[in-house]
């Protein structure tokens, strides 16, 4: 699922993926056609989450701490019944955390595509078509304060068909 003219590189990555060891089991799905970023991620996450009820998603170029998967799995278990928590993330924007903050986690209004996990019931709430866009625009200042101006611009571009991001 790469760019036109990169068939050899795509095959190299597929062979590498097939060689990965260290997990109880590995399932991979290779696409015959380039679906684009948004459709690939949304479709892949939906496939896994529909089968298992939850999912952990990683970017392909991350370097993880040894306890990363344990952290996300604990978060999935701990917050599973808290409908206010949409996802558990292993990365966030830079925030000021007090030096004496005693916990391993904190709440934040933004999500991150760089290592995260969620549950099927939360995933099913996402409005991929941005049907509520008029409400977002009407409450623009509050949205930007909560999510950031970059997210507002990205969603606006998605709504206008200029961007096909999923995050």
Task: Please place each PLM-identified region on the residue numbering.
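An acidic/histidine-cluster motif and surrounding catalytic segment
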Residues: 1-57, 62-167
